[in-house]
C-alpha cells in the first residue's frame, strides 16, 4: 500500500460537549471539543472526525461554532457528520472550516442527496457513514450485513454491501464503515465486514467500531481499510496516536 494509512480520532459532540468520557490530564476541560481536537492535532492525528449526536436541530449553530473554532487551530482535514440533511447543511459546514461532511440517515431516506452533494461540492467532500450489523436469526439481506439507523437501534432491511455500492455510484467519496456489533466491545474491528465492502467498492474505507488495543489496527488495514477510526481508546488515554502508528509501521504500512 503506497498511500499512508490514516489514523483518525472521533469526537462525539452533544450540545457542544464531547461525550463518551475523556481523560486527558493536560487539558483544562476535557469535555471541550476544540481543546480535544487540538490535543489530537498535537499527537499528529491525520484527520479529526466530529459526530454531532445532538438529537435536536436547535444545536446546529453550536456545532458550527465548534467547527469554526477548531479550524482556527487545527490544520488537518476535519470531517463533520450528524444531522446533515441538505446540500445547504453541507455548505454551511464547509464554509466554517470542515473539509468533508458525513451523511447517514438522510442519504438512506433520500439517496439523491449523495449525488446532489457530490455534484455541487465534489466527491471528495462526501463521506457516507454506514452503521452496519450482522443479521441475527432470519436473514433478509443477501450479504448478511444490514444497515441500521438511530445508533443501531432501528433496522432498515437494507443490505449494507448493496448500499455502499449504490452510494459509490451516486458519488460518495469515502465510506465510514462502523460495525454496530463491534462498537464498544474493544475486541477488534469486524474484519469480515471490511473485506466484504472492500470487494465491492474502490473508494476509501474508514474502519470504525471495536478498537481496544494496538494490535487491533493492522488487521483492519490488511482486510482492506484505508484508514482506522477510534474514540474511547484515545479519549481514555489507553492508546496514543503514536502507539497506533508505530504498530502499523511495524507491520510494514506507511504512516505520516
Curated annotation (Swiss-Prot):
One of its GO terms (molecular function) is lyase activity. It is an enzyme of class 4 (lyase). Gene3D superfamilies: Aldolase class I (3.20.20.70). Its main location: cytoplasm. Its EC number is 4.3.2.10. SUPFAM superfamilies: Ribulose-phoshate binding barrel. It is found in: Cytoplasm. Pathway: Amino-acid biosynthesis; L-histidine biosynthesis; L-histidine from 5-phospho-alpha-D-ribose 1-diphosphate: step 5/9. GO terms for biological process: L-histidine biosynthetic process. It comes from the Bacteria. Keywords: Amino-acid biosynthesis, Cytoplasm, Histidine biosynthesis, Lyase. IGPS catalyzes the conversion of PRFAR and glutamine to IGP, AICAR and glutamate. The HisF subunit catalyzes the cyclization activity that produces IGP and AICAR from PRFAR using the ammonia provided by the HisH subunit. Heterodimer of HisH and HisF. This is Imidazole glycerol phosphate synthase subunit HisF. It comes from Bifidobacterium longum (strain NCC 2705). The gene is hisF.
